[in-house]
Amino acid sequence: MFQQRSCGATCKSVVIAVLWVMTSGGLAAQSVTDVGSASSVSANPTLHKAAVSRDPFVDPLDAPAAMHENIARLPLMSIASAGKRLVAVGMRGLIAVSDDGGQSWSQVPAPVSSDLLALSFPNASQGWAVGHDGVVLHTADGGKTWIKQFDGRDAAIKLAANYQARIDAGDKTLQPYLDQLTLNYKAGPSLPLLSVWFKDSEHGMAVGSFGMAISTDDAGKTWRPNLERIDNPQFLHLNSVGEVAGDVYIAGEQGAIFKLDQGSGKFKLTQTDYAGSFFGITGNQDVLIAYGLRGTLYRSADHGASWGRVESPLHGTVTSAVYVSPGKAFVFVTTAGEAVRADSSLHDFRSLGPARPTVNTGVQVTTGGALIISGLGGPTAMALQ
């Protein structure tokens, strides 16, 4: 029942890592501070750890991120706004900030060298980053300094203890979740957290591979397991969590979309007719868009109750999307380097320029109305035409 399976092409970080290795020529000939080795092959925890240090081995959870003089083309996995500041995270613990709308970037220290995959800033000062090795980082000053709050080592002990205590107190329904949790960390702490979302400066949630879900009500000082809150008996990979127009959604593999029921506090499954992975959901008060592999887009006009496929001109896997309210437009970016604008009806798609010769991983709108796209070739600014 609890057979572990590979993350495979269902995890965005794996898709991106494979493309990075293919385009960079791999790790073998790269130095430890080179961009090529910085990918660290997210798909393979062994290579992920081996690339961090040659001799002696230092676990990425124990090694601060290497500092670089020039980060303009280092690989980034996600980007977010912290007030007027932009913050991006990437391979091998890279954290970069920009205070001029993405025109220039500077690296800030990170306490780990694990790959960082996602960000959430509920306000201009408080922010969280998550990634490989189950790591959760926190900043209280808008991304200038970071501390580690949680990691896969903590998860293997503290999350299991939480479930075991509740089972011992009589809640036997939690046993399958404890079994899955134990299986997830049987091989060590490398299981990634793929996405994080904070409602405010106290309440947040992170999700990841094999149904992993954790939450906090005290700004990340303590984390508890939340596998049982999600209608996910197969423990599908959970690729993203976030809020759209007041509702909270989780996008997963095998066409699974979960919506938070405010009354019960549980995420209920809406199964689409899509067999692939969704990597995120964006939208507004009127429409939701779920995006996934090979340019896949699904649309809902009833707050996620039902979904239908949209004809899409996109070729690459859609890694990120944003709704730009002033222009009433959606912007999608892909692993094929595409950046495309679509009207709110999703009938008119227009390219924002030639495809970048890199993998796009994220997109953010600045306070000035420009687009900043993160990717494996670094960040780039683009006008919203």
Regions found by a protein language model. Give the residues of each.
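A periodicity- and composition-biased signal for non-globular, repetitive helical segments
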Residues: 9-10, 18, 36, 281
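Residue-identity detector for glycine
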Residues: 8, 25-26
